[in-house]
C-alpha cells in the first residue's frame, strides 16, 4: 500500500513539474527519493539497469524540472552536483573520509535566528542558505 501511495505521489510530482509520467521518469524520481544525495550519473546508472535505452538527457531534464519546481535542491560539491530531496532548512554533514552526506536539523533554530538577524540588521531578505559542515561520520570516526 505504501508503495502505491509513493508511486501516486511521484506521478503527481511529475505532472506538477510539467512532465509526462513515463516509466523512465518515474524510475528517475523514485531513485532520487530513495538515495541519499545522489548525482545525476548515479541515478542514471541505477535506472539504466531497468531501462537500458534511457538517455542521460532524460535524467538531467527530469532533475532540472524537479529542481525548478522546488521539489529537489541542487548541491554542487567539488567534482559533482548532488541532489537533495530535503528542501527544508537543514545543515549537510559531509564526511571528509568517505564523502557521505547526512541531513541534520539539529541547528535549525540557529539558522532561523541567523536569517532573522540578517534581515533585521541589513534589510536583506534571505530566501535560502546552504550550510555544509565537514568532519567525520560516525562510521569513519569509529575506525
What role is predicted for each listed range?
Residues 68-143:
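Non-DNA-binding regulatory cores of transcription-related proteins
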Residues 42-48, 59:
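A short acidic, leucine-rich amphipathic alpha-helix
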Residues 26-31:
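Pre-recognition alpha-helix immediately N-terminal to the DNA-recognition helix
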Residues 32-33, 46:
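Long C-terminal interaction/binding lobes of large macromolecular proteins
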Residues 5-17:
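Short, Lys/Arg-enriched N-terminal segment that forms or immediately precedes the first helix
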Residues 21, 34-39:
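Short capping segments at the starts of secondary-structure elements
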Residues 59-69:
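Basic amphipathic alpha-helical segments that dock to polyanions
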